[in-house]
Amino acid sequence: MPSRAYHEGLWQAVPAGLAPSDLDLRRRFLLAHVDPGMRVLDVGCGEGAFAAALARAGAQVVGIDAAEEPLRRARARHPELDLRLVDGEGEWSLPDAGFDAVWAGEVIEHVADTAAWLSEVRRVLRSGGALLLSTPAVGRLTLLRMALSRRAFEVRFDPRGEHLRHYAPGTLRGLLEDFGFHGVQVRSAGGVPGERHVLLARAVRSRF
């Protein structure tokens, strides 16, 4: 199980957060699926950029993160937001079925116990609510480089790296379906054809 030091270390490694173009790509995807008045949980809210965008769009937002450093930055920039520190791998102190949507931007690849994490997402989502997430993609050109170069493979899948897991569209879709989500949509975005760098997914929580 990753320690709090692991999560804090991620934010020391990326002090500036996402690049503006990457931020905009994910923000447009997120806001396309959220309506005013919806109750939205931002999991791994980081510096609060997405939570702030959701609030401006009229959503009722709660942001949670497993690291104190990004929350400190977020509270300084967005004091109006409801932002909370949680155990990254344990149960969140949030009500059952309390949200219409859960957003997790660049989070699932850092989760050691994916089964427990998805079970917690299901618990806090209402029946019929949507999970929206983004995660880095492994493009075809990257796969080709890894097939041709042992060094490229080792760098990408170094267990000491910041990503604990890597997902392809099919594996992400299958994982979400296995955990009781339906209508799963996964698409590659960003970058160039053959080397898309992000997966964007939407999945609906089943009633059972």
Model-derived segments and spans:
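Short N-terminal helix/helix-N-cap motif within the alpha/beta-hydrolase-1
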Residues: E69, A112-A116, L143
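A short hydrophobic/small-residue beta-strand
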Residues: V61, L131-L132
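Conserved class I S-adenosyl-L-methionine
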Residues: L132-E154
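Short glycine-centered segments of the SAM/dcSAM-binding site in methyltransferase folds
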Residues: R39, G128-A130
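A short glycine-rich, Lys/Arg-flanked "PGG" loop and its adjoining helix->strand segment in the class I
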Residues: A116-S127
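A short His-aromatic
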Residues: E106-H110
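Conserved N-terminal segment of class I S-adenosyl-L-methionine
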Residues: M1-P95, A101-G105, L118, F157, ...
